[in-house]
Amino acid sequence: MNYNWDWGVFFRSTGVGSETYLDWYITGLGWTIAIAIMAWIIALTLGSILGVMRTVPNRIVSGIATCYVEIFRNVPLLVQLFIWYFLVPDLLPQGMQDWYKQDLNPTTSAFLSVVVCLGLFTTARVCEQVRTGIQALPRGQESAARAMGFKLPQIYWNVLLPQAYRIIIPPLTSEFLNVFKNTSVASLIGLMELLAQTKQTAEFSANLFEAFTLATLIYFTLNMSLMLLMRLVEKKVAVPGLISVGGK
């Protein structure tokens, strides 16, 4: 294919104010990172709680966590996003509806919807990783803690979870990378994250190949950097004698 690449397009004016196409990418990357970080905070927090719930010796508690996982893991992310953005606001009390629909600007409401949606969707996956990490520990860990007089919350907080987190760093890293990639669904509800800015650049500049090539390089560089960083963290906190789940 005889195609003349024009990489200088990113430094040209978009025709909207004084912005260049590169400015659009920077703005989109900022939204992508913000969505991913906020969603990951939700996922790691709730996923840890539900992961613990799935391993406690109480059928009701573990059953609640199991139901959550099965529901959120088996409904497509895009369907969940549309539910959170179009349906859930109409189910809120009138005061919250007015705040969400009238006081918030469309960008903020879209941001909140995608953060909650992606956070709760990823929670189900993190829950399973935490459960696997806890169950991978030697049974003697819990028995020894009980013999020392630890109560169940103390056993999880002081003994099981610190070790479980260390051995599930590889799969948690994969989930974190998935969060970054899944932020692209935000473009479907009007949030101008990286993918949306890429499509807008392609439409305005007519440089389709350059626009999506740059987006691909940004996603690849970001995810590879995170993966390499987490490999260093994994080596730093590795527990001698324990094998990482999904690792070597």
Segments (PLM) and residue ranges:
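Transmembrane alpha-helices and adjacent helix-loop boundaries
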Residues: 1-248
